[in-house]
Amino acid sequence: AQGVEFRDLTFGQALEQARTENKLVFMDCYTSWCGPCKNMLKNVFTLPEAGEFMNAHFVCVKYDMEKGEGIGLKKQFAVRAFPTFFIIRPDGTVQHRLAGGSQWERFRERVARGLEETTSYAYLNERYQQGKLARKQYSHYVQALKDAGDRPAVKNVCMEVFGQLSDKAKCS
């Protein structure tokens, strides 16, 4: 058994391969000096169970955000922290965004939420922006924002939801 298979592809080739294989693209945005990035590559992505899960669902690629194609991708996807991971549809649109590394079990949960359309960052964010987010979806949305590392949005959404509650509900 092997770990995650990161393929040596350009971003365009990765999208094409994802279309061909009917998968999503998993993109690891890292830098050479980032400690958590190195930890993910050495201790998490090398696990056989990580490989089994990730390789089944994704065309996996990684790019150094300070070299080559990574420089443009960093701008295109507004990468502000390392590591940042994206789940990208074959049409190039982002389905889910994950900021920061973690142990495999936790990382797998975070990735799984992004695989599921209705708990993915893009879906929930779009519903929220359109004012169509159901009350029971707010907890999923806050989780997706946390996964994406968007702390200001987490605070705003929580304050908004709290503000909509009745006085009785606020105290229960």
Model-derived regions: residue spans:
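Non-catalytic, surface beta->alpha helical segment in thiol-disulfide oxidoreductase systems
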Residues: 79-120
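Oxidative protein folding and maturation machinery
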Residues: 128-172
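Detector for the c-type heme attachment site
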Residues: 38-42
